[in-house]
UniProtKB/Swiss-Prot annotation:
The keyword Cytoplasm applies. Belongs to the SeqA family. GO terms for biological process: negative regulation of DNA-templated DNA replication initiation; regulation of DNA-templated transcription. This is Negative modulator of initiation of replication. NCBIfam families: PRK11187.1. HAMAP family: SeqA. The keyword Ubl conjugation does not apply. It comes from Vibrio cholerae serotype O1 (strain ATCC 39315 / El Tor Inaba N16961).
Length: 177
């Protein structure tokens, strides 16, 4: 049996394809790829042992996300930022780095009259010429910035809630903006 590393999103996809409890990762991949065990190796292992998927599989990601956000809050880089907009942008960039797929889903919310996040500047300008769109560093996303600190805090709170962060870290992060 060989061990391979896979991205979190690929792992979740493979795990979601489990048909019965105890099904190994090798069995799932063989089924998904339509590969017989005979073609895989010349001398197949007697009993393939792979990952066992549990309902808590995604829990580790949240712990890593919480650690990353706590590290951000105590970092010299974050402490050195003097204005709310810079802290806001760094928080959004960090959330994207933690889990880009969840971030993408979490940023789909809209206000009554405004779109807050988009993948291009024009979409944000279309919801108001005074939105002051800015690119979120190291992401393909743009965000409106012409709003008060309270609105920025609400935006971050919404994203973090949708990404599944616990309320205590959400509160710490939003109050740090």
């Amino acid at each position: 049996m060989k061990t391979i590393e896979v991205d979190e999103d690929l792992y979740r996809y493979i795990a979601s394809q489990t048909l019965h409890i105890g099904e190994s990762a090798s069995d799932i991949l063989r089924r998904l790829l339509n590969v017989d065990g005979e073609l895989a190796t010349a001398a197949p292992a007697a009993e393939p042992k792979g990952i066992v998927v549990s309902k808590d599989a995604a829990f580790d990601t949240k712990i890593d996300g919480v650690k990353a956000m706590r590290s951000l809050l105590i970092s010299d880089e974050f402490a050195g930022l003097k204005n709310a907009i810079d802290r806001f942008m760094l928080i959004l960039s960090t959330l994207h780095r933690i889990d880009s797929a969840s971030f993408s889903e979490a940023t789909m919310f809209k206000g009554r009259k405004r779109v807050y996040f988009a993948d291009n500047e024009q979409t944000l300008l279309a919801s108001g010429q005074t939105t002051k769109p800015k690119a979120i560093p190291n992401t393909p996303f743009w965000v409106i910035t012409n709003n008060n600190t309270s609105r920025k805090q609400q935006m971050v709170e919404q994203v973090m809630v949708r990404m599944g962060f616990p309320s205590d870290i959400i509160e710490k992060v939003t109050h740090s903006i």
